[in-house]
Regions:
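Positively charged n-region of N-terminal signal peptides that target proteins for export
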Residues: 1-4
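Bacterial N-terminal signal peptides
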Residues: 7-15
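Carbohydrate-active catalytic/glycan-binding domains of CAZyme proteins
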Residues: 18-323
């Protein structure tokens, strides 16, 4: 895999990694996590955080107009903020995905978007999440002709009946003509629900479940997963630890790989992710500057051939900025 470099925003902020920088310790297409690995990249100069404000759970797409678009979790009454860039390092606010929050699941917030380009449309998967009542969390889907929306909501795709009580953090992936959705999160014995990462095949337009029963692919100790194919391997990235305890956050990114999209995904140490995901290969963790490094985006390749890997983190010196 080509060397990556990272992008941060602070404390609920976004950070990045790109293939051209050896000095970033913190670590195209269609937003599908499938691609990259082009010719020798031209180095990029940047420093983290690249966006120093509250922008958790990033997802990014290289759009048909040549620009890059970044989408993040709801901020106040901005229902999935969208940012635009020509170079992956300088971002400007471009609007919100929704003018009004989808109202089919009350008392929830818009979390963890996942942007994709499917059949000539921009397709946005999103979570309507409830922190204290995970049974109320659901995944929906919306569509737009433009990367900046507004997106038309197509309603609920998945809820707790899908096989995991924590129905959050969707990740779309297309492979060999089939479309898949991955999702899930932790167990919580104190709240009485079972977690885990599951996947299911989608319809041709990506807007409904094809009908197959969902399958478990990773254990209940990771969330914010992302699937990427490079060469003959599929890579399953996920975040484990605590996300939201400011400088005490232990969020970190782990990864396993498989020769089949259905798994099993295995880390370098031989740990099978379906059994114990949190003990897989750690590729990104906090340091003396940042804590809670996780919920990474797709791997995106820029026009110069550099691979970028975006994630959020708490900047210890500026905790009030968020992650």
């Amino acid at each position: 895999m080509k060397k990556l470099s990272f992008l941060i925003a602070t404390a609920l902020c976004i950070m990045a990694c790109s293939g051209g920088s050896d000095e970033q310790p913190d670590g195209p297409g269609n937003g599908n996590g499938n691609g990259g690995g082009g010719s020798t990249p031209n180095p990029v100069s940047f420093s983290n955080p690249i966006v120093g404000k509250q922008l958790p759970d990033p997802t990014i797409i290289h759009a048909a107009d040549g620009n890059f678009y970044l989408y993040v979790t709801q901020q106040d009454n901005i229902y999935i903020p969208i940012y635009k860039s020509t170079n992956m390092t300088q971002w400007t606010y471009a609007g919100a995905a929704f003018l009004q929050k989808p109202n089919w699941q009350p008392d929830t917030r818009l979390w963890a978007p996942d942007i994709n380009y499917i059949n000539g449309k921009y397709v946005l998967y999103y979570t309507l999440g409830h922190w204290d009542l995970p049974k109320n969390s659901c995944i929906g889907v919306a569509v737009s002709d433009s990367p900046v929306g507004p997106f038309t909501d197509h309603g609920k795709l998945l809820d707790y009946n899908s096989g995991t009580m924590q129905c959050i953090d969707a990740c779309y992936f297309e492979d060999n003509g089939k479309k898949y959705l991955f999702w899930g999160s932790y167990n919580s014995t104190s709240k009485g629900y079972e977690g885990g990462i599951r996947y299911v095949e989608l319809s041709a337009d990506g807007l409904s479940i094809k009908g197959a029963v969902s399958e478990k692919i990773a254990g209940p100790s990771i969330e914010g997963i992302m699937v990427h194919k490079r060469g003959n391997y599929y890579y399953l990235f996920g975040s484990t630890g605590s996300c939201c305890e400011e400088e005490r956050s232990t969020y970190r990114v782990v990864v396993g790989r498989s020769k089949n999209i259905e798994g099993p995904y295995v880390g370098k140490n031989g740990t099978v992710m379906k059994e114990n995901s949190s003990y897989n290969e750690v590729i990104l963790q906090g340091n003396n500057l940042f804590a809670g490094t996780g919920h990474n985006s797709e791997i995106i390749t820029d026009d110069e051939g550099n691979d970028w890997f975006f994630y959020h983190a708490w900047q210890k010196a500026k905790i009030d900025n968020g992650r």
